[in-house]
């Protein structure tokens, strides 16, 4: 549903073999998404990807803190790696969609 209105890019960190498998899976299952792989060998986080004027969704708090996105959403349940996140949290994709609609209504996009 979101892909009908927005450009969706999946940014994932990992090692080369892991990123190759993720890319194949995304191409097969989410062909409407663009994939950017960030190799842990070269970078330690996703901050090298320009997310200006974007909504960044991740389940890892440190990745949410280290980017230039206009909006950051911590996705999913509370875990050790995101328990300190105090910003916006969405527990499912319906909540994400509703939050995006809220942003649009406010004209803050």
State where each predicted segment sits.
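Structural recognition of alpha->loop->beta junctions
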Residues: 27-38, 90, 97
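Glycine-rich phosphate-binding "P-loop"
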Residues: 13-15, 28-32, 85
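Acidic, Mg2+-coordinating phosphoryl-transfer loop and its flanking beta/alpha structural elements
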Residues: 55-95
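Conserved Lys-Pro-Asp/Glu-containing loop-to-beta segment of HAD-superfamily phosphomonoesterases
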Residues: 37-67
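Short amphipathic alpha-helix with an adjacent loop that forms part of the alpha/beta core around
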Residues: 46-50, 96-107
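Short beta-alpha junction loops
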Residues: 14-16, 40-42, 78-79
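A structural micro-motif
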Residues: 6, 33, 54, 70-71
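Substrate-recognition element of Asp-dependent hydrolases with the DxDx(T/V) motif
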Residues: 1-26
């Amino acid at each position: 549903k979101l892909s009908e209105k927005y450009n969706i890019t999946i940014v994932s960190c990992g090692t080369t073999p892991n990123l190759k498998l993720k890319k194949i899976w995304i191409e097969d299952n989410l062909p409407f998404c663009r994939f950017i792989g960030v190799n842990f060998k070269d970078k330690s986080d996703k901050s090298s990807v320009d997310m200006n004027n974007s909504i960044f969704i991740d389940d890892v708090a440190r990745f949410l803190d280290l980017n230039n996105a206009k909006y950051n959403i911590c996705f999913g349940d509370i875990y050790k790696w995101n328990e300190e996140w105090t910003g916006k949290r969405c527990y499912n994709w319906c909540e994400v969609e509703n939050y995006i609609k809220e942003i649009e209504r406010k004209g803050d996009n």
